[in-house]
Amino acid sequence: MADRRKIGTKDKWKEKTWYTIVAPSFLGEREIALSPAADPSLMIGRKVEVPVSDFTGNFRKSSTMVIFRVKECTGKRCTTEFIGHKVSDDTIRRMVRRRKERIDIIMPSKTKDGYRLVIKIVLVSDSKLTANKRGEVRSKIIGFINERCGSMTLPELAQYIIGDNVYNDIVDTLKDVYPIKKIEIRKSEVLGRDGYVEEPGAQTQIEAQ
């Protein structure tokens, strides 16, 4: 009986194929991960998180992760789409210290090519702000983000968010309201695109190489 069970046992790993996952074209289609699957259809929808530093070489941003989702497989090669980014909780905690005021902004926005997003921003001021001043800061930030999103495609916005210019631009936007120096777009999430229906797929998360 034991021998029969042994003969009938299959090595599931040997039945799987390893697929190469690549970044979107606006990030050079570089290889970002390898993942096994029994069928290429099972790769669709899998998520991969990659440090921003892997793309920019800026190791100060190694705690910021870009998030991709597999959208198509050809042979053993799988292409992805950008679906957001996130900054580690430890990085945000280090930003906020005692006697500092934290301002959180969570806002919806839309790119010029119709992608809907939620963007989360955290700012830290050196002193407590009045209610009016906080309102001015929020209004300026929301107006700035909506203007940038509305003037960019999703690939352009993704590159902008993970780059260095966005920080300087926000500081410049706020200089006439309050000189806030600690700013982070801590998370972005793509919700969908106008006129498109998202197809369900696997939701496995894959570690980048």
Swiss-Prot record:
Keyword check for Ribonucleoprotein: yes
InterPro entries (alphabetical): Ribosomal_eS1, Ribosomal_eS1_arc
Gene Ontology cellular component list: ribonucleoprotein complex; ribosome
SMART domains: Ribosomal_S3Ae
GO MF: structural constituent of ribosome
A family per Pfam: Ribosomal_S3Ae
BP GO terms, sorted: translation
Keyword RNA-binding attached: no
Swiss-Prot/TrEMBL keywords: Ribonucleoprotein, Ribosomal protein
Similarity field: Belongs to the eukaryotic ribosomal protein eS1 family.
Protein name: Small ribosomal subunit protein eS1
Organism in which the protein naturally occurs: Picrophilus torridus (strain ATCC 700027 / DSM 9790 / JCM 10055 / NBRC 100828 / KAW 2/3)
